[in-house]
UniProtKB/Swiss-Prot annotation:
One Gene Ontology molecular-function label: DNA-directed RNA polymerase activity
Protein encoded by which gene: rpoA
Any Gene Ontology biological process: DNA-templated transcription
Protein name: DNA-directed RNA polymerase subunit alpha
Presence of the UniProt keyword Ligase in the record: no
Subunit comment: Homodimer. The RNAP catalytic core consists of 2 alpha, 1 beta, 1 beta' and 1 omega subunit. When a sigma factor is associated with the core the holoenzyme is formed, which can initiate transcription.
Pfam hit, one: RNA_pol_A_CTD
Cited function: DNA-dependent RNA polymerase catalyzes the transcription of DNA into RNA using the four ribonucleoside triphosphates as substrates.
Catalytic activities: RNA(n) + a ribonucleoside 5'-triphosphate = RNA(n+1) + diphosphate
């Protein structure tokens, strides 16, 4: 009976993805139906993980020729070093190699220096190449070396400064998170005849190094991994293997026809109209799928759950290789055992 704690809760049937204007960076993701209260619980947890716990890449320090500290200015460069650093913080990177790595910019004026002027190396890609870093006047020369690394969340400039940092190396605050903005909304929704469910909508914006769908998938995986320590029991057996000598890979009860169950006429007709013939067909259905059956409501659902519970079964079970090719022959063979 322990499985009832989670098996009888309704679960979302699919994740609907609505791409934004830039599908690689923006999307709205909708999950429904959820049990009442789960929209807020999951929405808040996923938002916090998305904003703080995903791996990304960022510039962690810069060294500019003839510059000793961040309050300096560079001859022929309109921006001062502080403004250049602020612009470097907004450079978006995709990094497929272990850091730290060194990149460089070498430019001559007159010119508008952008992220696209960063000399890329294998395994590192600049995503927002049009992003402006600074402006050079005629005759100006600019050479800078950038240190890039991977990490998560926010790391202060102080922590990004190496112990053996050379004179002129300026550490930069690093915001590693590839997710730039997340918001969520919870609205009531219906499933079949039941109105008391949640619909969770997440709007996710990324820097382009990861798609919103993948970002949400990674966040859910992190949450799943963190919660695993709290599960202190083994999963109960599914509707699989029973006796060694019956020749079956599943419980023979699954071969029993649903019209032999003591169900109300309404419930029986709903199953018939949905082409559910055997108990094996029935138990693989989820609550959400059942509630989408025409004229099938919560009363019928509870009736079926009670009948299945008395047989040691429940909705949402997994049966491998169902239905067997010779299902009618097997049903007749085991008919007397019912």
């Amino acid at each position: 009976m322990i499985h009832k704690n989670w098996a009888e809760l309704i679960k979302p049937t699919q994740l609907e993805v609505k791409p934004g204007n830039d599908p690689a960076r923006q999307a709205t993701l909708v999950a429904e139906p959820l049990e009442r209260g789960f929209g807020l619980t999951l929405g808040n947890a996923l938002r916090r993980i998305l904003m703080s716990s995903l791996q990304g890449a960022a510039i962690t320090s810069v060294q500019i020729d003839n510059v000793l500290h961040e309050f300096s200015s560079v001859a022929g460069v309109r921006e001062d070093v502080t403004d250049i650093i602020l612009n470097l913080k907004q450079v978006s990177l995709r990094m497929e190699v272990e850091g730290p790595k060194r990149l460089s910019i070498n430019a001559k004026g007159p010119a508008v220096v952008t992220a696209g002027d960063i000399a890329e190396t294998a395994g590192i890609e600049v995503l927002n190449r049009e992003h402006v870093i600074c402006h050079l006047d005629d005759g100006a020369d600019l050479f800078m070396e950038l240190t890039v690394n991977t990490g998560k969340g926010y790391v202060s400039a102080e922590k990004n400064k190496p112990e053996d940092a050379p004179i002129g190396l300026i550490p930069i605050d690093a915001i590693y998170s590839p997710v730039k903005k997340v918001s969520y909304d919870v609205q009531p929704t219906r499933e079949g005849q039941v109105l008391d469910y949640d619909k969770l909508t997440l709007k996710v914006d990324t820097d382009g190094s990861i798609t919103p769908e993948d970002a949400l998938a990674f966040a859910a995986r992190i949450l799943q991994d963190q919660l695993s320590i709290f599960v202190n029991f083994d999963e109960p057996e599914s509707a699989g293997r029973q006796d060694e000598d019956d020749g079956l890979e599943f419980n023979p009860l699954l071969l029993k026809k649903v019209d032999e169950l003591e169900l109300s006429v309404r419930s029986a007709n709903c199953l018939k109209n949905d082409n559910i013939v055997y108990i094996g067909d029935l138990i693989q259905k989820t609550e959400a799928e059942m509630l989408r059956t025409p004229n099938f409501g919560r009363k019928s659902l509870n009736e079926i759950k009670e009948v299945l519970s008395g047989m040691g079964l429940h909705l949402g079970m997994d049966v491998e290789d169902w239905p067997p090719d010779n299902i009618e022959e097997l049903a007749k063979k085991f008919e007397d055992s019912f």
